[in-house]
Amino acid sequence: MYNRVTLLGNAQDAGRPQFACTKPCCEDARLNSELSRMPVSLGLHGDSFGLIEATRCIDKQLTMVNNPKISDLWITHAHLGHIEGLGQFGKESSNQKNIQLHCSDSVY
């Protein structure tokens, strides 16, 4: 059961700034790191820890919540920005095991 949510990111798939983006939002974030944003993700706290989306910034995002053991992972859809962090779960990285994976029908 989860009783608290942490916003771990609130930007579009690649975060901000994005590679090759010349819009003011990205240019400003390059000049001021306080304006940078990580890709959208949520941490679910309670008896265990759940993660919604596995982004490219998963290391920084989990550091924000003291690197909890992940019991559940939700992937809402298969855009690259929502799944890029999956490689970090493998043996060569964090060697995660026994994580319950929840996916939308579009992912299957």
Predicted regions and their residues:
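Conserved beta-strand hairpin/beta-sheet module of binuclear metal-dependent hydrolase folds
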Residues: Y2-M64
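Active-site metal-binding motif and surrounding structural segment of the metallo-beta-lactamase
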Residues: D47-H102
